[in-house]
Amino acid sequence: MALWLTVVIAFTCIGGLASPVPTPSPKALKELIEELVNITQNQKAPLCNGSMVWSINLTTSMYCAARESLINITNCSVIQRTQRMLNALCPHKLSAKVSSEHVRDTKIEVTQFIKTLLQHSRNVFHYRSFNWSKKS
């Protein structure tokens, strides 16, 4: 009996480690894309006074990395809604000391960052939409 219980607990733990990272709903991802499109569409002046943010690797923890990169941008009402959306999409809570998964070696303008995030979000949405439709 004890051996059986140990096996069940072991499989439960391994299953938890192997389970995929929670993914946002298609609706949440679509709303983020719409917001990013709104930001980039009618932009004439430099976004957020030309503020610079750390470039990130969007292939891992995209929403958390994007949130972390934009966290220090203040007094820029244009991206506040995006920051809130990224905060909701990231399953990890911000700690007092933010530690990054990416190497902080390249800074880019917020405008370029938002455009890159938009393109990557669209790719993720289309890829997931294709896979969701195949499962149906």
From Swiss-Prot:
Any one Gene Ontology cellular component term annotated for this protein: extracellular space
Major site of localization recorded for this protein: secreted
Paired cysteines (S-S): C48-C76, C64-C90
Alphabetical GO biological process terms: immune response
Signal peptide positions on this chain: 1-18
PROSITE patterns from the UniProt entry: INTERLEUKIN_4_13
Location relative to the cell: Secreted
UniProt-listed InterPro entries: 4_helix_cytokine-like_core, IL-13, IL-4/IL-13, IL-4/IL-13_CS
Subunit and partners: Interacts with IL13RA2.
Protein name in the entry: Interleukin-13
